[in-house]
Amino acid sequence: MVRGRHRSRDPQRRDLRGRDRRSASRTDARRQSAAERGCRRSQRGSAEGCACGRQTGPRAARSACCTACPSRSRRMSTTEGRPNFNGVPANKDFVAPSDSPVVHNLKKAGAIVIGLTNTPEFSFRGFTDNPLHGLTLNPWDPNITCGGSSGGAGSAVAAGIGTIAHGNDIGGSLRWPAHCNGVATIKPTQGRIPAFNGSATAERPMLAHLMSAQGPLARHVGDVRLALDVMSQADPRDPWWVPAPLAGPRPKGPIKVALARIPEDMDVDPSVRAALRQAADHLERSGYRVTEVDVPDIDGVWQTWCDIITNETVVMQEAGMLKVTSEDFHKAWGGMKTKANVLDLKAWMQATAARNGHIRAWQLFFEEYPVVLAPTTVKPTPGPRDDTVSADRVKEIFWGEIRFISAINVLGLPGAVVPVTLHDGKPIGVQLIAGRYREDLALDAAAAIEKRAGVLAHRLWETME
């Protein structure tokens, strides 16, 4: 609209300020608003929006696509000159020395970063709460979690605070908040979007790199796709970045989708089964061919993820984190460790070798089924602090409920989440998984579902007027 000179930035700035004020009190998702500063930047750049719109070609499209697009970065990401305390009181005086690659790429494309969103301490929980800024609420219902660790991002974008939000995902931190808040996202393939934290005092260990990914959250799948393109531009600070094309060859004939058969030990709520069936029907009506099948060793894949991430964290980070974190953090982290095997050096090497075998099995599976339709969780969204109830409750959540989310991280595969329906007024989403660097296939399937299911955030806004 702005690029095509159908609408100036001024009404967009006024809309942004108004919705920001109305929504923030309802969610507490934003921690430090740069909306006023962003709006001033938008005003200065109004003429640039029109000039940018006259450019042509793919690079020009990237330059113009985010012009005047209000975006939010999560607290774990660095924005030059802004605090970067990551939910930890001991870090409250940390100021980012430079923009992260994601923020740099967004700004380069014309996006206006309007603020930073809330995260749990060290972004290490699936529930967004911390001693500095407290609990972030879910705009649909304060009695359910907004997810984590990008819960502030998911809550904000659902409530209309910004168009695109940024998060990252090492165990579900993009996809879980997207599900909880009824928005769309993509956890890209490892290496798709460059990552670097200029505030970090040490390099991240290897498997943390291989299992984590940066990504966007938005209300519309089309905006997720747009933001993925922008965020994916090269940055020399990330040696793991991969210059892979954003679209690959189209599979011949109708695309076969594997509806993942859920393990018998996962107690599936009827509302989740109904949402999966509804998503499968949407895909069938869009020309896909959906078949319920077993996916390769989802239990073993999840256990490999749990063992690797837990042992790497215990060795590299645990002692330092426990010194400066809250009792709630200790409870949640203690619960996450209960399902992990303690690995010596040989067992660690065996776990990393097992990871290779799991990836190979899934890549072969994608030869027949290019897309997998899977649950995000098999249960209704839990309460806002359920991970502080007990260690058993944490294990129940990660192993018994969101197994299909965390398992995908160890494979390094792209996974999109799109909302499908509401149950008792709360959103339910599904996950679309594709082969390495085939985010296009996952997003195509997500867009097909969205076209028939609609954009759930619009229903939320009707209740917020």
From Swiss-Prot:
- Give a yes or no for keyword 4Fe-4S in this entry: no
Q: Where is this region: Disordered?
A: 1-40
Q: What class of enzyme is it?
A: hydrolase
SUPFAM superfamilies on file: Amidase signature (AS) enzymes
Q: In which pathway does it act?
A: Plant hormone metabolism; auxin biosynthesis
Q: Establish whether keyword Transmembrane helix is in the entry.
A: no
Identify the keywords attached in UniProt to this record, alphabetized.
Auxin biosynthesis, Hydrolase
Enumerate the Gene Ontology biological process terms: auxin biosynthetic process
Q: InterPro entries from the xrefs?
A: Amidase, Amidase_CS, Amidase_dom, AS_sf
Active-site residue list:
149, 173
Q: Which molecular-function annotations from GO does this UniProt entry contain? A: hydrolase activity
Basic and acidic residues: bias regions: 9-39
Q: So what EC number does this one have?
A: 3.5.1.-
Q: What does this protein do?
A: Hydrolyzes indole-3-acetamide (IAM) into indole-3-acetic acid (IAA).
Q: Which family does it belong to?
A: Belongs to the amidase family.
Protein's UniProt name: Indoleacetamide hydrolase
Q: What lineage does the source organism belong to?
A: Bacteria, Pseudomonadati, Pseudomonadota, Alphaproteobacteria, Hyphomicrobiales
